[in-house]
Amino acid sequence: MAAKEVRFHTEAREKMLRGVDILANAVKVTLGPKGRNVVLDKSFGAPRITKDGVTVAKEIELEDKFENMGAQMVREVASKTSDIAGDGTTTATVLAQAIVKEGAKAVASGMNPMDLKRGVDKAVDAVVEELRRNARKVTKNDEIAQVGTISANGDTEIGRFLAEAMEKVGNEGVITVEEAKTAVTELEVVEGMQFDRGYLSPYFVTNPDKMRVELEEPYVLIHEKKLSNLQALLPVLESVVQSGKPLLIIAEDVEGEALATLVVNKLRGGLKVAAVKAPGFGDRRKAMLEDIAILTGGTAISEDLGIKLENVTLDMLGRAKKVVVEKENTTIVDGAGSKTEIEGRVAQIKAQIEETTSDYDREKLQERLAKLAGGVAVIRVGGSTEVEVKERKDRVDDAMHATRAAVEEGVLPGGGVALLRAVKALDRVQTENPDQRHGIEIVRRAIEAPVRQIAENAGAEGSIIVGKLREKTEFGYGWNAQTNEFGDLFEQGVIDPVKVVRTALQDAASVAGLLITTEAMVAEKPKKEAPVPPMPPGGMDF
């Protein structure tokens, strides 16, 4: 086991504080509409330019082990806020730095760290309660656009695209962000359920111009296994032919005589049919087939259920208003499933999202949820260079999470003003001793930090701005850093989601509380590099 270094008391806190400052100072320059960019060196390719706090935080690794511990703890604040709210990472970092700085001073002056932490926790609870009480619900489309614009650093085009996407796919719908092949940013909305499997044979195509299959009001046969035996498939094909409707077959695979017969029937005009492979793999495939069955009001034919293909009747097949099958995608529009069953399935998937610990599983579950609940919107981000596209994509991601959060819990005045106004809630907090009271004062000072930083990044004097804001008592009155004007921030469209502000404060206080109460630090001793042996003298034998 390698030897360890141990640091105690003030020395430990000083080292940790230095690490916190290095990381926070690099992150906080990005805060606000006039925040600056940070350039990140990449071991390959062009450097990356970003204004996203969590991206900057994740790049920082310090040489000194003890300083690095402090930096990594604050990086955890940014990551946690990003995971929960998707935005507000820079605000969380600024708040954490402010609480840690004030807390370390108090501990150095002889106060009890545990009481300070209790005071900080009480203060945060009171402020969060005040924020929730003053929240406004977001209902109008232009309010959603404003939230997106603010989070995308004043880019109105991004705000508009996000509002349009949310209007079309609903709050549960999936909005994905991709890099465009052109310089133009565009929005594409896929209504209904789409999965990434295309037709098994080009002979199924009904629209040769667009090379796709279009089936109006088809039956949908959902089968879990491979279909190769024609005899098992004949009874259901005959029933569909008699009904005069088209048929979509979704199965693990369709091959051999079964595929040949379907193609021949289609070409002779006897039956309008298309076959596609089932989406996903393993257990996920089973779940997705069940989703399609619920959406179309059919039954997923599976041996687990004891249903044989030859016994399938028309009422076991799903129905849809329209199905479009392209080379690589299948879209089912307006499935005939019952609303209550779809809602039940949505609730079930939501519960699984809450329980899962895997990010990959969560992402896949959210995709399934969106396909059932609304649809999928794709924002393709364009730009002149690869560096510009990546920077813009970061901002679109932030803005997308912020708009979702705004719809969920409502909005507050932006620019750090909501936290400043929530200070009055601290006067009502009861404490048991002077050290807890000091913990509350730490939070009182710390929640000014975002306003000060936004002002300083915009070239103004932070303390003057804070002083002017304190003169007025209206909750929405604040300073717009973009226009350098004072006024009602709700009217000016400078708004932040409650969830983002709340999460930033709670996560910052949580990690800062741990740092304040740290009394010892243990790290591995740096290994001394062995000196390189000298080169032997060159030979003289020539």
Curated annotation (Swiss-Prot):
Transmembrane segments: none annotated. ATP binds at residues 30-33, 51, 87-91, 415, 496. The keyword Iron does not apply. It comes from the Bacteria. Pfam families: Cpn60_TCP1 (PF00118). Gene3D superfamilies: GroEL, GroEL-like equatorial domain, TCP-1-like chaperonin intermediate domain. GO terms for cellular component: cytoplasm. Keywords: ATP-binding, Chaperone, Cytoplasm, Isomerase, Nucleotide-binding, Plasmid. The keyword Ribonucleoprotein does not apply. GO terms for biological process: protein refolding. Its EC number is 5.6.1.7. InterPro entries: Chaperonin_Cpn60_CS, Cpn60/GroEL, Cpn60/GroEL/TCP-1, GroEL-like_apical_dom_sf, GROEL-like_equatorial_sf, TCP-1-like_intermed_sf. It is found in: Cytoplasm. It catalyses: ATP + H2O + a folded polypeptide = ADP + phosphate + an unfolded polypeptide. It is an enzyme of class 5 (isomerase). Forms a cylinder of 14 subunits composed of two heptameric rings stacked back-to-back. Interacts with the co-chaperonin GroES. Belongs to the chaperonin (HSP60) family. Together with its co-chaperonin GroES, plays an essential role in assisting protein folding. The GroEL-GroES system forms a nano-cage that allows encapsulation of the non-native substrate proteins and provides a physical environment optimized to promote and accelerate protein folding. This is Chaperonin GroEL 2. It comes from Sinorhizobium fredii (strain NBRC 101917 / NGR234).
